[in-house]
């Protein structure tokens, strides 16, 4: 059976456009199409990079976001607020795209109800936290450095403990990064028994710093990371 003439013509144009359309028209069409695609892509990208989008799922709204609202990152004397994307999405475009690709699997978690109840969330909290700590360790706390920079720190305005640790372990020593010490600053910590909390001062500094205890203590952790 022969195709109608208009379908045959459409197929010919689609498979060999240069035979029917001028190079200028094709170039202009490609440019316009590219602009529309790029504009639509970036619009969608920015729409998924907002606090409203992050908290549109009840898993986030009822658990981690509610915890964030009780921290200094959400309400503070300066009025500068860090939202979900500030801490979980890098600002540089290439790093942002890579993070979006990583986060796509979280959509499956939502669809299959991995943490759709408080009980499920608490049961998975340590696993989720360790995954995020490992990610921030691997990228040298890239999202923290969206706002914080050790070269811009005024150590004279920090506590003696914070100034000493920042100077020795961020300025003078390689291999350390923000998340090594500053866990639990925006969300509650999971059960840390048997796990190195990271907030204890390094062994070579403990003798010279105020003692917050040698075992895990939630209030001690909050006091330490607040510095």
Curated annotation (Swiss-Prot):
<dbReference type="GO" id="GO:0009061">
    <property type="term" value="P:anaerobic respiration"/>
</dbReference>
<comment type="similarity">
    <text>Belongs to the NapC/NirT/NrfH family.</text>
</comment>
<keyword id="KW-0479">Metal-binding</keyword>
<dbReference type="InterPro" id="IPR036280">
    <property type="entry name" value="Multihaem_cyt_sf"/>
</dbReference>
<keyword id="KW-0614">Plasmid</keyword>
<dbReference type="InterPro" id="IPR051174">
    <property type="entry name" value="Cytochrome_c-type_ET"/>
</dbReference>
<protein>
    <recommendedName>
        <fullName>Cytochrome c-type protein NapC</fullName>
    </recommendedName>
</protein>
<feature type="binding site" description="covalent">
    <location>
        <position position="147"/>
    </location>
    <ligand>
        <name>heme 3</name>
    </ligand>
</feature>
<keyword id="KW-0812">Transmembrane</keyword>
<dbReference type="InterPro" id="IPR038266">
    <property type="entry name" value="NapC/NirT_cytc_sf"/>
</dbReference>
<feature type="binding site" description="axial binding residue">
    <location>
        <position position="88"/>
    </location>
    <ligand>
        <name>heme 2</name>
    </ligand>
</feature>
<keyword id="KW-1133">Transmembrane helix</keyword>
<feature type="binding site" description="covalent">
    <location>
        <position position="54"/>
    </location>
    <ligand>
        <name>heme 1</name>
    </ligand>
</feature>
<dbReference type="Pfam" id="PF03264">
    <property type="entry name" value="Cytochrom_NNT"/>
</dbReference>
<feature type="binding site" description="covalent">
    <location>
        <position position="84"/>
    </location>
    <ligand>
        <name>heme 2</name>
    </ligand>
</feature>
<keyword id="KW-0408">Iron</keyword>
<feature type="binding site" description="axial binding residue">
    <location>
        <position position="106"/>
    </location>
    <ligand>
        <name>heme 1</name>
    </ligand>
</feature>
<keyword id="KW-0249">Electron transport</keyword>
<dbReference type="GO" id="GO:0009055">
    <property type="term" value="F:electron transfer activity"/>
</dbReference>
<feature type="binding site">
    <location>
        <position position="100"/>
    </location>
    <ligand>
        <name>substrate</name>
    </ligand>
</feature>
<feature type="binding site" description="covalent">
    <location>
        <position position="144"/>
    </location>
    <ligand>
        <name>heme 3</name>
    </ligand>
</feature>
<feature type="binding site" description="axial binding residue">
    <location>
        <position position="60"/>
    </location>
    <ligand>
        <name>heme 1</name>
    </ligand>
</feature>
<keyword id="KW-0813">Transport</keyword>
<keyword id="KW-0997">Cell inner membrane</keyword>
<keyword id="KW-1003">Cell membrane</keyword>
<dbReference type="InterPro" id="IPR005126">
    <property type="entry name" value="NapC/NirT_cyt_c_N"/>
</dbReference>
<dbReference type="GO" id="GO:0005886">
    <property type="term" value="C:plasma membrane"/>
</dbReference>
<dbReference type="InterPro" id="IPR011885">
    <property type="entry name" value="NO3Rdtase_cyt_c_NapC/NirT"/>
</dbReference>
<dbReference type="GO" id="GO:0020037">
    <property type="term" value="F:heme binding"/>
</dbReference>
<feature type="binding site" description="covalent">
    <location>
        <position position="181"/>
    </location>
    <ligand>
        <name>heme 4</name>
    </ligand>
</feature>
<feature type="binding site" description="axial binding residue">
    <location>
        <position position="182"/>
    </location>
    <ligand>
        <name>heme 4</name>
    </ligand>
</feature>
<dbReference type="InterPro" id="IPR024717">
    <property type="entry name" value="NapC/NirT/NrfH"/>
</dbReference>
<feature type="binding site" description="axial binding residue">
    <location>
        <position position="187"/>
    </location>
    <ligand>
        <name>heme 2</name>
    </ligand>
</feature>
<feature type="transmembrane region" description="Helical">
    <location>
        <begin position="20"/>
        <end position="40"/>
    </location>
</feature>
<feature type="binding site" description="axial binding residue">
    <location>
        <position position="148"/>
    </location>
    <ligand>
        <name>heme 3</name>
    </ligand>
</feature>
<feature type="topological domain" description="Periplasmic">
    <location>
        <begin position="41"/>
        <end position="227"/>
    </location>
</feature>
<feature type="topological domain" description="Cytoplasmic">
    <location>
        <begin position="1"/>
        <end position="19"/>
    </location>
</feature>
<feature type="binding site" description="covalent">
    <location>
        <position position="178"/>
    </location>
    <ligand>
        <name>heme 4</name>
    </ligand>
</feature>
<keyword id="KW-0349">Heme</keyword>
<comment type="function">
    <text>Mediates electron flow from quinones to the NapAB complex.</text>
</comment>
<feature type="binding site" description="covalent">
    <location>
        <position position="57"/>
    </location>
    <ligand>
        <name>heme 1</name>
    </ligand>
</feature>
<feature type="binding site" description="covalent">
    <location>
        <position position="87"/>
    </location>
    <ligand>
        <name>heme 2</name>
    </ligand>
</feature>
């Amino acid at each position: 059976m022969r195709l109608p003439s208009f379908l045959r013509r459409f197929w010919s144009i689609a498979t060999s456009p240069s035979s029917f359309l001028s190079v200028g028209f094709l170039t202009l069409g490609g440019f316009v199409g590219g602009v529309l695609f790029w504009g639509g892509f970036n619009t969608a990208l920015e729409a998924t990079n907002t606090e409203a989008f992050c908290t549109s799922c009840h898993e986030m709204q009822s658990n981690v976001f509610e915890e964030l609202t009780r921290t200094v990152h959400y309400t503070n004397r300066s009025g500068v607020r860090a939202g979900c994307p500030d801490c979980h999405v890098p600002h540089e475009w290439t790093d942002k795209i890579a993070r979006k690709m990583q986060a796509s699997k979280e959509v499956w978690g939502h669809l299959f109800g991995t943490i759709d109840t408080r009980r499920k969330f608490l049961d998975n909290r340590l696993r989720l936290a360790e995954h995020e700590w490992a990610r921030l360790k691997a990228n040298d706390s890239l999202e923290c450095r969206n706002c914080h920079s050790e070269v811009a720190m005024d150590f004279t305005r920090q506590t003696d403990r914070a100034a000493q640790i920042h100077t020795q372990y961020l300025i003078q020593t390689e291999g350390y990064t923000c998340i090594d010490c500053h866990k639990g600053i925006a969300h509650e910590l999971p059960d840390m028994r048997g796990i190195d909390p990271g907030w204890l001062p390094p062994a070579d500094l403990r003798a010279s710093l105020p003692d917050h205890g040698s075992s895990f203590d939630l209030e001690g952790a909050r006091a330490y990371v607040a510095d």
